[in-house]
Structure formats: C-alpha cells, structure tokens
Amino acid sequence: MIEKHIVLEDIDPVIFYGVNNANIQMIKALYPKLRIVARGNVIKVMGDEEEMCAFEESIIALEKHCVKYNSLKEEVIIDIIKGKTPQIEKTGDTIVFSVTGKPIVPRSENQLKLVKEYEKNDMIFAIGPAGSGKTYTAIALAVRSLKNKEIKKIILSRPAVEAGEKLGFLPGDMKDKIDPYLQPLYDALQDMIPAAKLKEYMELNIIQIAPLAFMRGRTLNAAVVILDEAQNTTTQQIKMFLTRMGMNTKMIVTGDMTQIDLPSSQKSGLVQAMHILKGVKGISFIELNKKDIVRHKLVTRIVVAYEKFEEKQKEERLNDSKKREGDSNK
C-alpha cells in the first residue's frame, strides 16, 4: 500500500467537494478500494498503485472541469471517472462561466466584436455608453485568459478621481478612499471567480486592482491590463499607462465619451489617444452604442433622452454663435 497527496491548486475546494461534501463522498464510493481523506485543498489517498494512478487522473480531469465551469455536478463526476466525455449543454460564444455555472456570453454584436478583436490584437480600445457591457466583457476575457494559463496576472485600473471628488477630502486610509471608485471592477470579478479563490488571487497579487497613478514606473509582463473610465485620464496619464505594456501582455482601454469629468480646460487623454493611435498596427478600436446596453430598458431611454438634449444644446449654441457673428457684422 502506498500513499499520495494531491493538491487542488486552481479551484475552491468547497466547490470541488460539494455541498455537505457530497461530491467527495461520491468519488470515494466510486473508488471503494482506496482510502481517501480530503482536508482543505489536499486529498490524501492510500491504496494500490494502479488504482491510485487512475484516481489521480480522474481528480485532475475533475479539477479542470471545475476550473472552467465553476461547478461540479454528480453526472459529470460519474462520466469523468468512467472515462466518458461529460454531456455539457452547448453554449455558443461563451467567454467564461459565472460562479453559478451560467455561461457569460457576448450579448450584442459589438460585444462579440470585442471578443474577436481581443483574439487578434494586443491592444483594444472599447468606447461606449454606460451599460453597454464594455468593461464586463473585458474582465470576462481577462478571467478566461487567466484560467487558460495564457497569462500570469490581471491588472485592473481606473483614474482615482471622478465626478469632481478629491481623495484628500474623503475619510479613511488610502484603501478606504479608493475602494468605492474600484467597486464596479470587484463586482464583475465576484460574478466570475468564487469568493475564496478571488481572495487568494488578490492576496498573491495575481489579480490587482489599483488607481491609475499606481501604474507609474512598472513594466507589466504576461498580463491582461484593463484601464476603465479612460475618458477621465489626461494625455500624460494615458500615455504613461499605454507604455507600461510588457511582453505577452494585452491591454483593453474602456471609456464613455459622454461622461468626461475632467475640468473643462483639460482635454481627455482618451480622445487624443484615439486620434493619435488610429491606424497603428496591432491596435483595434471598437465603438459600442445604445443598442449594446444590457441594463434595465430604462437605461437605453435615458441615454437617448440625454443624446437629444445634448444635440439640442449644441444646435442652440451654434445658432447663438451665428447670431452674435451676424450682429457684429452690422
């Protein structure tokens, strides 16, 4: 009789073992000749060497399934241990699976375009209104790359100041000050990565969420780096960010041109970057619009209403300018 320890490295053991350890109990029942003890992320197994080799192969296959789908069902366990291919429901253009096992898919033509451009280019600019799914899709792509071990880390960043608020006047330490700005990024990650695994990734700096200023001086290798709310960067800030790109790295820059919170005297770095970098090989630009909005149906109506209001204001300013010009010529 020999003994072996198998470490579950890439998954949350709670999901793998199942509710009330139902999954591990089933695995034990399917390997009655082995003595199996599971504690934490380590499975200790004792028994015949040949039987143990088959057991280890099954555990590796089950772990891979669990990493991909964030779930492990009874019928899947039976199929894998019996050497069959699990019957998985076809999920089309699935990017990644949520913590509940549901497929996260592009929900519009432009979101699908973002997915395809990500596969072809190393730098993507995704511009569109609130709720168009640009950031959520970008994070899903990053999580997929991490799960597939194509990269070593995910770095998510935002400008730290939005809507006119200044960090120095907010209560708490630096983490307390910046966390509210970064919460939308946490929310997306929590949809896609089990809580215990996400906490581990963040403690090990495999997933990093930080204000844009924290990027200065770094070279980011083997990573997917996402800059969200890029319309609120200055020219110097976005140039600094884009030049952090290292080897085997992809960058996704997202922004909404209708929500620029910079002082009126300051130009948006995103606007300038789109003009300067247009036509550069390896950089893709995707524009999402109100048709891509996947929030409550009222959000689309609100966006349309504001577009009409802003267009009307633009016309009024133009008419006023023409009137003043006519008056000055009299």
Question: Locations of the language-model features?
Answer:
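Primarily NTPase-proximal linker/entry elements flanking Walker-type ATP/GTP-binding cores
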Residues: I77, P86, G92-P106
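Conserved helicase motor core of SF1/SF2 NTP-dependent helicases
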Residues: V42, F97-E109, K113-L227, Q231-K330
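N-terminal presequence-like segments and adjacent domain-start helices
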Residues: M1-V14
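Interdomain "pre-motor" coupling segment immediately N-terminal to P-loop NTPase/helicase cores
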Residues: A29, I36-T91
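Hydrophobic side chains in well-ordered alpha-helices
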Residues: N23, F55-S58, I238
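A short linear hydrophobic-aromatic micro-motif
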Residues: K33-I36, F285-I286
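Short amphipathic alpha-helix segments
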Residues: I11-Y31
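Short, surface-exposed acidic/glycine-rich loop or hinge patches that mediate macromolecular interfaces
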Residues: I11, N21, E49-E50, N232, ...
